[in-house]
Amino acid sequence: MNDLPDRFPRGWFVLGHQRDFPVGETKTIFGFNNKILISRSEDSLITVDVDGDTSWPVLELNQMVMVWHDLEKQDPDFIPDKIDACYSDDWSDYGMASFLVKNNCRELIDNMADKGHFGPVHQAPFEGFWNEAKDHTYTQEMTADSPILGRDLFSQARYEGPA
């Protein structure tokens, strides 16, 4: 077992979909090794209470509610990009699922650079693989040929702010 304390990166973290937080209700989730209370007031503003601290910045964007985490209590230094498709009637509404992943979120972004796992894990051995890290974003493009998922696969993934 590791005796080091959990550390969480600085950045925006999604707490849930906007519709998960109706007016007048308070939801409780666990994150950052704390109980987090999320409330939407009668004037539709979201507040977040992390172990009695209500100063955490909150953002509603792309139909998600996010909270800014920074151990040094610095203000946010970026805002995620607005995704126009989240507000378009051309797309159906999306859902969100929550499940426990027993590792630190920093390890998830490491997956982006591990091109060797795509064959054995996803049954999609890569043919082309490209990554770019710029400011708070990480973009990956990959081409693959999978007998299960289909030929000539193309994937573009973009991650913003922590993992």
Which sequence ranges carry the predicted segments?
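Residue-level signal for tight coil/turn positions that link beta-strands
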Residues: N33, E42, N62, N103, ...
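N-terminal pre-ligand scaffold of iron-sulfur
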Residues: M1-D49, T54-L61, V67-H69
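C-terminal catalytic domain of Rieske-type non-heme iron oxygenases
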Residues: P57, K73-A163
